[in-house]
Amino acid sequence: MKRRNFCGDLTKAALLASVVNSGPTLAGSIDGKSDGADREQRESLDLLLNVLTPSKPPATGRINAFDETWEQWQKRTGELPPKFSQLPSQPLLPNVLSGVRTAADWSRRKAEIRAQLEHWFVGRMPPSPTNLRVVVTAEKREGDILVRDVRLEFGPEHRGTLHLQILIPPINGPLPVFLTNHNRTRPWAATAVARGYLGVIYFAADPIYGFEDDSDKFIELYPEYDFSCLARWGWAASRAVDYLYTLPEVDRRYIAISGHSRNAKQAVIAAAFDERITAVVPSSGNTGEANCWRYTTDPFVTESIEQITTVFPHWFHPRLRFFAGREDKLPFDQNSVLALIAPRSLLLTCSYTEDQGSDFGFEQSFRALQPVYEFLGAPRNIGLRLRAGPHPTTAGDIESYLDFLDIAFDRAPNRTLVPTFVFGYTFDDWKAQSGESPASKQASDKIRWALGSEPAQVPFPSKAPKHILVSAGWMELLYGRPLKSTVMKSIPVPFGVDLKADLYLPVKVEGKLPLVIWLHPFSYSTGYSRYAKAPFEELTRRGYAVLAFDLIGFGTRVEHAKDFYLRYPKWSLLGKMVADTRAAITAAASSDMVDRSRIYLVGYSLGGKVALWTAALDPRPAGIACVASFTPLRTSKGTEGIYAYSHLHGLLPRLGFYAENPATLPVDYDDVLRSIGKRKMLLVTPMYDRYADDSALQRMLKNFPDINVERPKDFNRFSPRTQNLIFDWLDGQRA
């Protein structure tokens, strides 16, 4: 195994001359001594400062009264990351019901979760003010609707203010309430009014929408509290509820809150901390709402902790950024936040084709919450609605949100809401569909056993017409495919069974080109296209052709995995991905522009897995380059391990029979690597990849001295620096 480490000279943070850590024991406190624990925390901080993109001052809004960026906050406070070695690794979502047997247990658990959230996630919020004063500033009629503008005054010397607008329909009350937080969603409130709700808008929202954020002044009003921007918006919602509780028109049993995108995040925070809110419809809040931090990491190509705290450092408490790349160490996740809403009504909803959305992530949250709602005797109070389309909503979406609220508020007794799954996989469902049980003896061909029984298929090229017309469907228009560029061109390539790939080429092609087959990670909502333009341009600039397509269950094929095991119960999703990749090799090799002796498989995360398993069966790839792609399945500790294949992503369900006893697993990655043989291979294994047991991985790789192993001092990220390792390695194969 040829190794290279990238420790480098890390940024030295000369920030810590005088440090006071206000957090609990997990965060640690620094007293200037250089003991081992302090060194660990300092090294963790140096790593963050060295590898993460520096945060940016918010375009609107503030972190607090002093800091514009996360780095400024860290320097001023001197806070350090927690002692990660003392925190348990929880690669799967936290089980919020662990140890909960009674209602009293659940009350204690909720208090524990809220304490965790106030420290790590949103900051400490002030208690409810007891001196609310109401000033009606205007009343008018819009048609038959009474519109009342109100200013709430509260807090020290009544210096806190919050403006509301109340839309009251001409209906005898008391009425259910539809609460939202900025005038851009006024049509949502208007739709609710048409459906018999009292509409309420409170003006605590991002000023980017053109309206003042009343909650920004809470920073100076409550200087002893460090609640973040989204928490300030959510706290403002509770002040609106304070007022609503004084109105005879309001039915206190039925107060719903909703919001879209960043406003969905604050709606969840509001409801998690205020149990007077009895229903929540957070629309496409995604990361920081229902898409859990453990499933928004770089391999999922959505919005990671690094990304969201870089662009929006004020949304959450700055301590959250400490967990970038170490999401498994978070003592909570968004399912914990959402569990605080139970047993009240909650609809999880997003588009499964929007950049930051994820059918997989939302479904995992939904499934994690179902036992909570069942424990609390309200299994019907949680819903899942995944829609197609871009991030913005339509009028029909809002009507469907109100349909859910009508059901929740007993206004539609004859209606029920059926969860809409897109991925829809569970290991238990697969067992029932396949009828399989643990193998009584080890299979002779371990790799084919794991991949399952591939059905007989017509090989490519078949005796079809010369010009085969294929389409990836309407979603490729949403993704802007093929990717547009002035430095490369593209042509469609049919392959396999009615599938379409895009072949990217230099604008001027001279001779036969080496081919890179680009295999994407777990990018459920966008497939191969998000963030692919820059590396494709670099590869074509260096003289490569690049073939890219969506794996089954991702991007334009996101809907194709749901019924896969009903159709092919003895096969596997990874087996299908391998078959499609082999078909893509065949199709590309038939092109006059491709040098079939120089075909390389390149993959990150899931794509690396597909590359390795494909090469294990197919001798045609000349080389394989993989980034953060696997960990030994028999011996790894503290990772998703077998569960990632069998229970989470449904890639190799048969492995699930060995999840509780991994040492007996019939096949592991040493078998895969041996099957690939002596072909050229690059493995990039970041030192801080939370998905890998680094010590177990390096022990395995010692048995393969011909593999080129690069070990950047980084988390599991597909950064430009990591991509350049691949590009340079590819160039080295041409020398």
State each model region's role.
Residues 5-27:
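N-terminal export signals
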Residues 32-161, 342-488, 493-498, 671, ...:
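Alpha/beta-hydrolase-fold serine-hydrolase catalytic core, especially in secreted/extracellular enzymes
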Residues 158-161, 168-177, 498, 507-515:
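Proline/glycine-enriched tight loop/beta-turn segments at coil->beta junctions
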Residues 242-298, 586-640:
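Primarily recognizes the serine-hydrolase "nucleophile elbow" in alpha/beta-hydrolase
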Residues 282-337, 358-366, 372-378, 627-672, ...:
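Mobile cap/lid helix-loop segments that gate and shape the active-site cleft of serine hydrolases
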